[in-house]
A protein has these predicted regions:
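Short, well-ordered alpha-helical segments enriched in acidic and aromatic residues
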Residues: 296-305, 395-407
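Secretory-pathway/luminal and periplasmic proteins that interact with or process carbohydrate-rich
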Residues: 182-192, 298-300, 407-413
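A short alpha-helix/helix-coil micro-patch that ends at or immediately precedes a cysteine
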Residues: 152-164, 289, 293, 381-392
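PPIase-associated folding chaperone regions across multiple families
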Residues: 13-40, 44-57, 64, 193-283, ...
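Short helix/turn-capping signatures at newly exposed starts of structured segments
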Residues: 167-170, 293-300
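N-terminal targeting/tethering segments
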Residues: 53-204
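N-terminal targeting leaders characterized by basic, low-complexity, disordered sequences
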Residues: 1-14
């Protein structure tokens, strides 16, 4: 029988004990009173601290649609923003040994920030002092504002994806699971739980569940726009709006200028070019124009350039010639002069073209001595060459990628000429030729050896370009609406883990 039921039974039986005689109360000593007061004060202080921290973690930094971004989630995005900016710290004068919330933004930094993709409109409401320092703006504030922009765009797209019923595929989920497993193994190796690791790295309130949700949101926002499809009518209508934004040409370029021939001063600097130097530069350019050699090491490739980009770099005359006069079955080479520089241009391709779907494998040159037991780049290349010579199939190419591709699946969709030119001039030249599924080639570049296996035709460059533009315009429109109503709370953002030190994060 329970104690309460036993007490109840005794009361019901009338067997309740008699009231105990009252005892005289003892007065507590002053020492005990002081000790109790100290305990109460400590409890109040620490209880207040923990309560305050809990309140800070629960604050809403911004809202996108119906989703409220709390401080812990903001920490994940903020940490990524800061991490991606780490390599640019020296350019903008950030001290990598000092917390970001202890350093102020400078006007010198503002000059470089747009180059690194950082919007400086946040600074419009602030004034720098005579020394070029924004006394009221720390790097933490600017980074937090940049993070806000990333979150708004991410969730604007994510919300649309959810509304459309889009979900990540098995490969995307597997990638997220793999990353989570890797992080957990790090935590175990360091003798802590995975939630403890997240809290330590990202801030209080951050845990494994929150990080996984963050990864799902980011991956969804990144992949969903690529699934958007546009009709031929939509693509045609957008192309007609501004053809000049989509029409492109590709060409080889040889550049020379008078300063290339200027003498060297005793201190090692270049002397000012003379008229004789200018004459040599012009003669050199004329020689190349008369006998253009694309294989010349000084010749570069400019692939998929619009008329506006050519005008900006090489002059309006060059742009007009390339788009209106130059032809593969006619005039292909011409010399132009702009700003004391001579440009010899040879047309390589013009108009729309079919892209390729391919499998790609790149074996990077060894930059240092290879560790014992690891294969050298030379051995990898020899093994791949021998295997592909014996078995010239797509399945074997996939096997080579699985063995030597460092985790990449090697799949490339809609490979364009500009991406080929970015690898090497020889890859670009190969891409100009007509290829079919099963065609395979290797290319030795300055950085390593590249293998390409064509799996089929992709979409036309024009369709891809216009579709990307339509997608970007859609993203910008929903982003603008979401940004206007996000209700960004900078005070709440500053309650996040914003005091990171670039040298240790």
């Amino acid at each position: 029988m329970s104690a309460s039921r036993e007490r109840k039974k005794r009361m019901q039986d009338g067997n309740t004990p008699a009231a105990a005689p009252q005892k005289k109360k003892k007065k507590l000593s002053e020492g005990w009173l002081l000790a109790i007061c100290v305990v109460l004060v400590v409890a109040l202080v620490f209880g207040g601290i923990f309560g305050f921290r809990a309140y800070q973690r629960s604050r809403t930094v911004l809202t996108v649609g119906s989703h409220e971004v709390k401080v812990p989630e903001f920490n994940f995005f903020y940490n990524n923003t800061v991490g991606s900016f780490k390599n640019y710290a020296s350019y903008v004068g950030i001290d990598t040994a000092t917390a970001l919330d202890k350093q102020n933004v400078t006007t010198n930094a503002v000059t470089y920030l747009p180059i690194f993709g950082v919007d400086t409109s946040y600074l419009a409401d602030y004034q720098a002092n005579d020394e070029g320092i924004y006394e009221d703006v720390t790097w933490a504030q600017l980074m937090a504002s940049a993070t806000k922009d990333v979150i708004v765009q991410t969730y604007a797209v994510y919300n649309e994806a959810v509304a459309a019923g889009y979900t990540l595929d098995e490969d995307d989920i597997a990638e997220i699971d793999s990353e989570m497993a890797s992080i957990e193994s790090v935590a175990v190796a360091q003798g802590e739980t995975v939630d403890e690791l997240f809290a330590r790295v990202f801030g209080n309130g951050c845990d494994a569940e929150g990080y996984r949700n963050y990864m799902v949101v980011v991956h969804t926002a990144a992949h969903y726009p690529t699934t958007l499809k546009y009709t031929d009518e939509e693509i045609s209508a957008r192309y007609e709006e501004s053809k000049e934004d989509f029409d492109v040409v590709s060409f080889y370029l040889y550049t020379t200028k008078a300063s290339d021939y200027a003498a060297e001063n005793e201190d090692g600097t270049k002397a000012d070019p003379t008229e004789a130097d200018a004459a040599k530069a012009k003669a050199d350019a004329e020689s190349m124009a008369n006998d253009f050699r694309a294989a010349n090491d000084a010749v570069t490739v400019c692939a998929d350039y619009t008329k506006a980009s050519i005008t900006s770099s090489y002059g309006e005359e060059a742009a007009t010639w390339l788009f209106e006069t130059a032809a593969l079955d006619g005039e292909q080479v011409k010399l132009f002069e702009k700003d004391d520089t001579y440009y010899v241009i040879k047309l390589a391709a013009k108009g729309d073209y079919q892209s390729y779907n391919a499998l790609e494998l790149f074996i990077k040159n060894d930059s240092e001595e290879v560790a014992e037991g690891e294969m050298t780049a030379e051995r990898k290349i020899a093994a791949i060459n021998a295997s592909m010579k014996a078995d010239h199939t797509e399945e074997n190419m996939k096997a080579m990628i699985k063995t030597y591709g460092n985790g990449s699946n090697g799949v490339v969709e809609n490979m364009m000429r500009n991406s080929m030119a970015g690898v090497d001039k020889s890859v670009f030249a190969w891409g100009l030729e007509k290829h079919k599924a099963g065609d395979f080639s290797s290319f030795i570049t300055d950085n390593g050896t590249m293998y390409l296996f064509i799996t089929g035709e992709g979409d036309t460059r024009l369709n891809v370009s216009v579709s990307n533009t339509l997608s970007n315009e859609w993203i910008n429109s929903i982003n603008e609406a979401a940004s206007a109503s996000c209700g960004y709370d900078e005070d709440a953002a500053m309650a996040a883990n914003v005091g990171l030190v670039l040298g240790t994060n």
